C-alpha cells in the first residue's frame, strides 16, 4: 500500500580522487604536449641552421619577462587582496540579516586563504603571458642606438622615439592596468566583506564605507593618478605621430592647444592624486570627488573644447599659412624615414623638354638592344610545359628576373628553379613513402634571355616560334658537357642542381612540406632521374635516427609512419621549414621579409636571395603607410601571392640581404645598411648573427636586386613627397600617382601597375644597367608626369633617379598609350579574328625613357590555343608606341621601324631558328610594313602590294574559315594547319588593302 511519502534524494557521489587526478593529468598533457613538442623540435631546427643563439636569446628573454610580469602582477593582486582582508570590519551588526553580505560572509571567510592564493596566481600567469610578448620592446631598449637626427619640436633624438618611448609606454600601461585590477579587487572585496555598504532609501539605510576600505581605495586611486601624470607627459611625444587630414605630426592646433592641455592636465592630475591621498586622513570624500570633477571638466574644456575652437576659428580660415611650418617638418621627416632624401634621390627636372630625334633614340643602344620580349608574369605555363620534365616538378606562378653577361654585354634573363611541386603529385605518388622519402627535391636552374625567342611566330595557329630559348643547368645537361657550354659561359653552371629548399616545395596544401632523407641501408631511394636514385648527403636536416626525435616529429606532424616505417633509419634526417622566407624570418624574427625570393647561381650553387627590412611603427612627423596596401598591385593580386604582414610602418630600411642555399638550407644574413640604427640595435641583441657587408662576395653582389616591395613603398611616398614647398604640398597641385595597370585582366585594371626589372641605359652614364622602373602620372590625370628608376648595379646600388617631365608639355601616359595601341585598326582586326580560337594576353607595358628625351612604350602580345590542356603562351606580336605612332609586328625590329626608329640596335636581339642557327630579323622587312599613326606627319614608306586582289583575299579567307570549321573534329595537327592557312589568308587580304 502506497504511503505517499517521497524517498529522500540520494547524494551525488563524487568521483574518486584517482579519477579526478587522471582527468586533470590528461587535460594538462593535451595542453602542454603540443607546446613542448613545438619547443623541442624548434630547438633542434635552430641547432641545424646554427642559429641556436637566436632561439636561446628569445626564449630566455621571454622567460625573464614572464617571471617579472607574473611576479609583479601576482604581487600587486596579492597585496590588494591582503589589505582587503586585513582591513575588513569585524562587526556586521549594522547589516541587515537578509542582506547577501551577511548571509555569505561566513562562507567567504572560510575561503579567504584559498582566494588569496588562487586569484594572484591566475592574474600573475595572465600578466606573465601578456608581458612576455613585449620581448622585442625590452631588447631594443636595452640595446638602443642614437639616430643622430632630432625631432623638430622637442629636440629629442629619434632613438628616443624608436627605443625608449615604447619601453616607457609599456611600463606606464602595465602599472595602470595593475592598479585598475587592484582597485577592482579592493572594491569588490570590501563590499563582500562588509567594508562597503550601499544605501537603501526604502529601508532608510545609509551608505557606509569603513576607514580601511576608504584608505585602501584612496591610495590605489592616488597611485593610478600619479601613473596618469606620467602618461600625460608621454602623450606629449605622441602628438608628433598624430594623423592629421593633410599630413602626419603635430600641427598648429596640437602645438598651441593640445600640448599645453597635456601640461595643464598633468598639474590637475597631481592635485587629484593629493586629494585622494588626503582621503586617508579625512572622512570627507567630497574633496577627492571634487578633484575628479575638476579633472573631468578640465579634460573636456582644455583637452577638447579649446582645441576645437582654435581649429575652427583660427586654423581653418588660414590653414595653409598656419600649417606651413608643420607640413615642412612632415616632408623632411618622411623623406628620411623612407630613404628618399635629396642625398638618395636625384631629380632630373624638365627631362625631355628638348625632345630627342629618331636618330638619337636609335642610338640609345643600351635600352633599344635590351627591350624585353619575355614577360615573367605570363610565361610560367610555358616554362612548365617545356621544362617541367616530370609532373611532380613545377615553377612558381610568377617567374623572376635577373641579369647575366652575354658576350660582354649585360642582358636580363627570366630565371626559375625547377622545384618539386607537392601539389602536383598524382595517385600513388601521394603515398606517404613516395611523397616524403622518394619525391624529395627539384632539379636544376632554368634561364631564358628576355630579349630572345626561338623563332619568329608570324601565324597565330603555328606550333612553332615565339618561345623562350632556355639555358639549363640540371642533372641531365650537366651529364652532357657539350650541352652545358651556354651555362658555363653565362656563369650559371650549377655544381649541385638538386633543390631541397624553395617556396614551391614548401607550398603543400596540407602544410606538410617535410622530406625524410639519408641512408637507410637499402641504397638510394630518392628520385633523381629516370635511371638514377639519390641519397641526400648535405648538412641540412635534423637527425631523427633515435626514437625520441622520431616520436617528437611524429607528434608534430601527427604521422605514425615516422615511427613505424623502415624508410626511417639511424642515419635519417628530416628537412622541414623549407620556404626560404620562413627560414629567414625564424632566424631573424625582427626582420620583415620581401614578398618575393628569387634564385641565383652563386659560386656554382643555387641560392635563394631574400631581402630583409628593418621597420619601426612610427617616427616623429613621418607619414605611416600600410605595407600591404603599398605593395598591392595587379600582379600580386593575379598571382595570389602571400602579401606582407598587414602592418603600418613609419620607417623602413633594406638593411639585410639573406641567402638560403637551395641544397642544404644554410641561411646567411649580410648587413646591407651599416648606418641603420635599428639594425645596430638588433645586432646588439643578437651578436654575430648578421655578417658585415664586406663578407658579401662579388658574385653574390652581382645578383642582388633593388627590392621590389621597398621600391613600391618608396614610389608611393615619392608620389607626394617629391614636393618640397609646403604651400604646394597643401594644395596637392603637384602630386603624382602610380598609374593603374591597363594590361591587367578584366576586373583588375583598377589595380596599380607593378614596377618592372629591365636592363636599360643608366641615367648618368648611358651604359647598360639593371634597373627597377615605374612611371608616374599626374594626380587624377592620365598624362605622364615622371619616371622613377632604382639601380641594382653593384657600383651604384640603390641610387634612385626621377626624371620629371616638363609641366608645359603633354606626354601620353600608360593608359593612353595602351588605348592607342589597342584601338589601332590592324590590332583590333587581328584580335577580333584571333580571339575566336585563342586566348590573348597583354604582356608587361614597359615605359622606357630613350634618347635622352623621349618615351617609348613596349608591350608584347602572347597567344595560347583555347580548349587545349597542353597549350601554353607564346610571343605572337610586339606593340610599340612612340610620338603618337603605333608599331605592330611579329618582331621588335619591325615594330620599331614602323614608328620611325632605325632598328639597327635591336638587331642584337637574336632569334634562334629551328635548325639551331642564330639569325637576326630582316630589318628591310620593316620597311614593308605600314605604321599606324596618330597625328604624325612622319610615317614609313608604304609597302608593296602583295599578289591577289581584295575580292580574291575575301574568298581566300572564307575558304580558310570553312576548312577551319571542318578541321575542328580532326587532329590537333590538322586544326593547326587550318589555322595557319587562315592566318596567311588574312595577311594576304590585309596586304592587298594596304596597297590599295
From Swiss-Prot:
Residues 925-939 have a biased composition (Acidic residues). Residues 940-950 have a biased composition (Low complexity). Residues 920-950 are annotated as: Disordered. Its main location: membrane. It is found in: Cell membrane. The keyword Ligase does not apply. Belongs to the UPF0182 family. This is UPF0182 protein CE0802.
Amino acid at each position: 500500500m502506497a504511503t505517499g511519502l517521497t524517498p529522500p534524494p540520494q547524494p551525488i557521489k563524487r568521483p574518486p580522487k584517482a579519477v579526478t587526478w587522471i582527468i586533470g593529468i590528461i587535460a594538462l598533457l593535451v595542453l602542454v604536449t603540443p607546446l613542448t613538442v613545438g619547443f623541442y623540435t624548434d630547438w633542434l631546427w635552430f641547432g641545424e641552421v646554427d642559429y641556436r643563439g637566436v632561439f636561446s636569446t628569445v626564449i630566455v628573454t621571454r622567460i625573464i619577462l614572464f617571471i617579472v610580469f607574473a611576479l609583479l602582477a601576482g604581487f600587486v593582486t596579492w597585496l590588494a587582496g591582503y589589505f582587503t582582508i586585513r582591513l575588513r570590519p569585524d562587526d556586521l551588526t549594522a547589516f541587515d540579516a537578509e542582506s547577501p553580505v551577511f548571509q555569505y560572509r561566513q562562507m567567504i571567510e572560510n575561503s579567504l586563504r584559498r582566494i588569496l592564493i588562487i586569484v594572484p596566481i591566475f592574474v600573475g600567469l595572465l600578466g606573465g603571458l601578456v608581458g612576455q610578448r613585449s620581448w622585442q620592446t625590452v631588447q631594443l631598449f636595452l640595446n638602443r642606438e642614437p639616430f643622430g637626427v632630432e625631432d623638430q619640436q622637442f629636440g629629442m633624438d629619434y632613438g628616443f622615439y624608436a627605443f625608449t618611448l615604447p619601453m616607457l609606454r609599456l611600463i606606464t600601461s602595465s602599472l595602470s592596468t595593475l592598479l585598475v585590477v587592484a582597485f577592482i579587487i579592493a572594491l569588490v572585496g570590501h563590499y563582500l566583506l562588509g567594508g562597503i555598504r550601499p544605501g537603501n532609501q526604502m529601508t532608510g539605510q545609509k551608505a557606509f564605507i569603513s576607514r580601511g576600505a576608504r584608505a585602501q581605495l584612496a591610495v590605489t586611486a592616488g597611485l593610478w593618478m600619479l601613473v596618469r601624470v606620467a602618461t600625460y607627459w608621454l602623450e606629449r611625444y605622441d602628438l608628433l605621430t598624430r594623423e592629421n587630414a593633410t599630413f602626419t605630426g603635430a600641427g598648429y592646433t596640437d602645438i598651441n592647444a593640445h600640448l599645453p592641455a597635456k601640461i595643464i592636465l598633468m598639474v590637475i592630475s597631481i592635485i587629484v592624486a593629493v586629494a585622494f591621498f588626503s582621503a586617508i586622513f579625512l572622512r570627507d570624500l567630497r574633496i577627492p570627488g571634487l578633484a575628479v570633477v575638476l579633472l573631468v571638466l578640465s579634460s573636456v574644456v582644455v583637452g577638447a573644447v579649446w582645441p576645437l575652437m582654435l581649429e575652427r576659428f583660427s586654423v581653418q580660415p588660414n590653414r595653409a599659412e598656419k600649417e606651413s611650418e608643420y607640413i615642412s617638418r612632415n616632408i623632411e621627416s618622411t623623406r628620411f624615414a623612407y630613404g628618399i632624401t635629396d642625398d638618395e634621390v636625384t631629380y632630373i627636372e624638365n627631362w625631355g623638354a628638348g625632345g630627342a630625334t629618331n636618330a638619337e633614340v636609335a642610338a640609345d643602344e643600351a635600352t633599344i638592344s635590351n627591350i624585353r620580349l619575355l614577360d615573367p608574369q605570363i610565361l610560367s605555363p610555358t616554362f612548365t610545359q617545356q621544362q617541367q620534365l616530370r609532373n611532380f616538378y613545377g615553377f612558381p606562378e610568377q617567374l623572376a628576373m635577373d641579369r647575366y653577361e652575354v658576350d660582354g654585354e649585360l642582358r636580363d634573363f627570366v630565371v626559375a628553379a625547377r622545384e618539386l611541386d607537392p601539389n602536383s603529385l598524382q595517385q600513388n605518388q601521394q603515398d606517404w613513402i613516395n611523397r616524403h622519402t622518394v619525391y624529395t627535391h627539384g632539379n636544376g636552374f632554368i634561364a631564358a634571355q628576355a630579349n630572345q625567342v626561338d623563332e619568329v611566330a608570324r601565324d597565330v595557329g603555328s606550333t612553332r616560334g615565339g618561345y623562350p630559348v632556355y639555358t639549363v643547368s640540371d642533372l641531365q645537361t650537366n651529364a652532357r658537357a657539350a650541352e652545358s657550354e651556354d651555362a658555363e659561359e653565362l656563369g650559371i653552371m650549377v655544381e649541385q642542381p638538386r633543390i631541397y629548399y624553395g617556396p614551391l616545395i614548401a607550398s603543400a596544401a596540407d602544410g606538410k612540406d617535410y622530406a625524410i632523407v639519408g641512408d637507410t641501408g637499402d641504397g638510394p631511394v630518392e628520385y633523381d632521374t629516370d635511371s638514377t636514385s639519390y641519397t641526400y648527403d648535405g648538412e641540412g636536416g635534423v637527425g631523427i635516427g633515435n626514437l625520441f626525435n622520431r616520436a617528437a616529429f611524429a607528434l608534430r606532424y601527427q604521422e605514425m609512419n615516422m615511427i613505424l616505417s623502415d624508410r626511417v633509419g639511424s642515419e635519417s634526417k628530416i628537412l622541414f621549414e623549407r620556404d626560404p622566407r620562413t627560414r629567414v624570418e625564424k632566424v631573424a624574427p625582427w626582420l620583415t621579409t620581401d614578398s618575393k625570393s628569387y634564385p641565383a647561381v652563386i659560386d656554382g650553387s643555387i641560392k635563394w636571395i631574400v631581402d630583409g627590412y628593418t621597420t619601426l611603427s612610427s617616427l616623429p612627423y613621418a607619414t605611416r603607410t600600410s605595407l600591404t596596401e603599398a605593395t598591392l598591385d595587379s600582379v600580386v593580386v593575379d598571382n595570389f601571392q602571400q602579401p606582407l604582414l598587414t602592418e603600418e610602418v613609419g620607417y623602413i630600411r633594406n638593411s639585410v640581404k639573406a641567402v638560403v642555399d637551395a641544397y642544404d638550407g644554410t641561411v646567411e644574413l649580410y648587413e646591407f645598411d651599416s648606418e641603420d640604427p635599428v639594425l645596430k640595435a638588433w645586432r646588439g641583441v643578437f651578436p654575430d648573427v648578421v655578417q658585415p657587408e664586406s663578407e658579401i662576395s662579388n658574385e653574390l653582389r652581382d645578383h642582388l636586386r633593388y627590392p621590389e616591395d621597398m621600391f613600391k613603398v618608396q614610389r608611393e611616398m615619392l608620389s607626394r613627397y617629391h614636393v618640397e614647398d609646403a604651400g604646394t604640398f597643401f594644395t596637392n597641385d603637384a602630386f603624382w600617382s602610380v598609374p593603374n595597370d591597363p594590361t591587367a585582366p578584366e576586373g583588375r585594371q583598377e589595380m596599380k601597375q607593378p614596377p618592372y626589372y629591365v636592363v636599360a641605359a643608366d641615367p648618368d652614364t648611358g651604359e647598360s644597367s639593371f634597373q627597377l622602373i615605374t612611371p608616374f602620372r599626374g594626380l587624377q590625370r592620365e598624362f605622364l608626369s615622371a619616371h622613377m628608376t632604382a639601380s641594382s648595379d653593384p657600383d651604384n646600388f640603390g641610387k634612385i633617379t626621377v626624371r620629371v617631365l616638363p609641366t608645359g608639355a603633354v606626354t601620353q601616359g600608360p593608359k593612353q598609350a595602351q588605348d592607342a595601341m589597342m584601338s589601332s585598326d590592324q590590332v583590333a582586326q587581328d584580335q577580333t579574328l584571333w580571339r575566336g580560337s585563342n586566348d590573348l594576353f597583354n604582356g608587361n607595358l614597359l615605359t622606357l625613357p630613350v634618347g635622352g628625351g623621349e618615351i617609348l612604350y613596349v608591350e608584347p602580345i602572347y597567344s595560347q590555343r583555347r580548349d587545349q590542356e597542353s597549350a601554353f603562351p607564346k610571343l605572337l606580336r610586339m606593340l610599340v608606341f612612340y610620338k603618337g605612332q603605333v608599331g605592330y609586328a611579329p618582331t621588335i625590329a619591325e615594330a620599331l621601324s614602323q614608328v620611325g626608329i632605325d632598328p639597327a640596335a635591336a638587331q642584337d636581339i637574336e632569334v634562334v631558328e629551328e635548325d639551331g642557327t642564330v639569325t637576326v630579323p630582316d630589318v628591310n622587312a620593316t620597311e614593308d610594313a605600314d605604321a599606324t599613326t596618330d597625328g604624325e606627319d612622319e610615317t614609313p614608306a608604304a609597302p608593296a602590294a602583295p599578289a591577289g586582289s581584295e575580292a580574291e583575299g575575301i574568298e581566300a579567307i572564307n575558304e580558310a574559315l570553312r576548312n577551319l570549321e571542318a578541321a575542328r573534329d580532326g587532329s590537333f595537327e590538322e586544326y593547326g594547319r587550318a589555322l595557319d592557312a587562315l592566318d596567311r589568308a588574312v595577311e594576304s587580304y590585309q596586304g592587298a588593302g594596304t596597297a590599295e
